[in-house]
Amino acid sequence: MKKNLIALAISSCLLLSACSDQSSTSSSTNTSNPAASIAPGAPGQSSLWAYAGKTGIGTSYEQYTNGAYSDAGASGTISKVWFSIAQGVLTETMYGLIHEAQLQELQFFIKSSDALDEEKRDTISTTSYLKTDAQGRPLSLAYKVVNKDKEGKYEIEKHFFTDPDSQSLMMRVIVRALTDTITPYAYVNPAIANTGSNDSAAYSNNSWTATDGNSSMTLKTSAAVVHSTLGFEGVSDGITELKQNGTLSNQYSTTGATKGNVAFTLQLPTLKQGETAQWDFVLGFGKNAAESSASADKTLATGYDKVLAHYNGDGDAIGWQDFLQKLPALEKLSATATDGGKLLYTSAMVLKAQEDKTHAGAFIASLSNPWGDTKSAEQSATGYKAVWPRDFYQVAMAMLALGDTESPRIAFEYLQQVQAGDKIKGYTGTPGWFLQKTHVDGEPEWVGVQLDQTGMPLMLGWRLWKDGILSDAEISGWYKKMLKPAADFLVNGGAVKIQWNDKTITPPYTQQERWEEQQGYSPSTIAATIAGLISAGDIATHAGDTESAKKYFSAADKYSAQLETLTYTTAGSLTGEQGNGNYYLRINANEDPNDHSALGTSNAQIISDESQVIDGGFLELVRYGVRSATDKHIAETLPEYDNQQLPDLLRVKYEFTFPGVEGTFPGWRRYGVDGYGEDQSNGLGYVEANNSTQGRGRVWPIFTGERGHYELQLAHQLQSKNGSNKVDIEKLRNTYIKAMELFANEGMMLPEQVWDGVGNNDAYQYQKGEGTNAATPLAWTHAEYVKLLRSYSDGKVWDRNASTEARYVK
């Protein structure tokens, strides 16, 4: 790999007679301007985030030191920089805490003899990995992106990775002029301190720096920059001038005392037809301009080869290969995959990459802002770069499935930071439940009570104890300080008061179910509640608290006995050739599942009859061992759930085909009448609730995994009863595992949602089954895929709770 890259660099210099200087001391022709020229036009256009369908994310791998990230540990300096790639360009790049974006995008504009092209719109992009093994499996999150002009005039190749020894990102750029003379312009749109319109910008000494408060970003390059300017987006920035005048004449070097949505434009050397140029760009970060400049200088001085080798973990350096070598299940699970393990290796690293490095164990939902290119960046927002205990549980269990014993343990220990109690600022009320959504530092963001998010930490603690990762003494300690309050809340509920939420919770009635939208009795919520209580009962028994153990077991039994009475309709309005109107509801707002009562309006969708809405949450009852896969209530719900004759509004199941792949592959929406997705009238991003009734939630690959788990458990039970049937298991593997692999994009990122073919598709022209502009990669989806592989490899459902199964499945 190194030899090829060195050869490429040499050939680039030979092809371009004035090949750019690769040192960090390159000069720029615009440094001679003696007086600072202040850019007009503040604050510029309103700022937005970037397209959320990422084809790559990355950060440096760092080792824990005593359960934390420390500069004094084996990894040395902890690099707290994360990046993302979408539409062929660098998008949100974070520094500090994992949600603190500092960059909206960095892309190139190419001026040819007859046009000014925008890289992300006027090229065809491909994404691959810089380092793979002989089977093509990625060995690090270092990317190669090649963007080819749609008219064949030029090609831009870029390599992305971070510096493990600095707070910086490196991007190597190779530009090839194929059939025309071209001039590249680098365009940089900062979003310092996680907002897009409060930045100041300055140029000095070949450094382009943006600052907002205590955060700064500095761009440096080895390129001999011909001309540069800065300004306010859409008013005085360089690209706006190019579009208006065809040339860069302004030479603004500061925004002065005014702030806004700023952008840098760097004119690079012109390439004649047949010429190639290679340059390195570095984004450095810090608390001020001096720190960010020093970070960039350090990386440029270290150089491409050494930084990449360290990032990869080559030789003695600690990098991504070291992480992969710690996962003993990789080879076994690769044999179960249908792609040889490519998506598995990617998933393992993607899951690990979405952990904060200030608060070890804080795993977020996604390194993206859903529908970001339509979402305002005027105010700081985490998007999905936050902690949900439910998504968090999926990740921890997936890491455990990979054979990682460190990350799940540290994740479990982190959970005490997001548990309601006197440590949570502004909280008064009953302690024990886990906050709906928080920043990685524990700051509450959303504060609804979701009982499944309190059951899952109990399940995780139980599993870590049973697997020997937590000792008997340790689980007893955690029982007293974290698990007992959680279990008590699942039994007794109580008064909750934080921010807007002033409510008394009475389990198993939940204020919100797993889609965070409805209150009532939910099969999926009750499944996690029961499994959590059985886990708590086992732990309490071990800890010598027999009275509490009895209470937990008794409550679980009560909830199990009430389950069908509260959530199963025998008078449903969904019927078909096979359906008979008997099925689990998505949620029941009262104690009568047959009264056809209305549900609350959600995502602007009015649901006048709860029995019209079905989802796959009932399958969680089987996954966690609350019900048998052959239970008649489960079996009778499947026809309605799978009914593809329903109108699109109510329909949940869709089937997909992929070019060059034999067969059809199933997918499911969250539930009927789901409005969390693209606007059906124009194909644009999700519109906030009550603003549009045209939103449509699409198919989520998660549910292909959930169904694959159910089918495995069903096959296991039928095999136990009727004898072996290996052909059926192989068919399931080539249906559900393969489907999830096909839902991944070219960078092997698994999305939250894929296009289902319903509604206007003009905006993005998705192929059916292609990931949309919702959150990608979604940690939950990658976790579900990993767990599906582990389940099929083991021949039993990975998440299944043995104590729960022993109690309820006879």
Tell me what each language-model feature is.
Residues N33-Q45, G152-E155, D163-G383, D472-A473, ...:
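Acidic/polar, glycine-enriched structural segments that form the non-catalytic walls/loops
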